[in-house]
């Protein structure tokens, strides 16, 4: 439990009223079968797959610090049909934004590394592509080789895409 309290310090709860727009989930929907961090941090012992949101957008260079994209993803994800009862899911909330972009990276890396240590499959919702570096750092911390997929609405191949030299 002390590990959960440690990562909870880096997370804010899921705003269920915003996501569900004050509607209730029914038993056929995925969200009604998930352990979700709302008032109390969930017990992750039974969870196999853990959702973690990152709203950080400072790495895009567009002047936006946070995005509501993780909650928009949740809004649709929680409403999906609950089709596979053998997979147990949890949503541990959203990484709190740090004072600097590197602080957010460090928080994300810490939380992800702890979830990996607990043998959880981590799915990150939201965040700009540069947050992938924090995810990678968590696996490096555990000396694990990883394969990563970044799913987005478009592919960033333009010549105007900024690259962060400190990455």
Identify the meaning behind each predicted range.
Residues 2-51, 58-167:
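Conserved alpha-helical scaffold segments that buttress catalytic/binding sites
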């Amino acid at each position: 439990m002390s590990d959960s309290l440690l990562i909870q310090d880096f997370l804010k709860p899921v705003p269920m009223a915003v996501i569900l727009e004050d509607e209730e989930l029914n038993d056929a929907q995925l969200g009604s079968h998930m352990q979700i961090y709302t008032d109390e941090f969930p017990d992750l012992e039974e969870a196999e797959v853990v959702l973690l949101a990152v709203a950080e957008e400072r790495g895009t260079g567009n002047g936006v610090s946070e995005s509501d994209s993780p909650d928009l993803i949740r809004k649709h994800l929680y409403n999906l049909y609950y089709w596979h009862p053998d997979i147990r899911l949890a949503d541990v909330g959203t990484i709190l934004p740090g004072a600097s972009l590197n602080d957010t990276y460090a928080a994300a890396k810490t939380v992800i590394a702890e979830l990996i240590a607990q043998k959880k499959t981590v799915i990150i919702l939201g965040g700009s592509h540069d947050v992938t570096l924090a995810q990678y750092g968590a696996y490096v911390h555990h000396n694990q080789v990883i394969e990563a997929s970044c799913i987005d609405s478009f592919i960033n191949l333009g010549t105007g895409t900024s690259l962060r030299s400190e990455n």
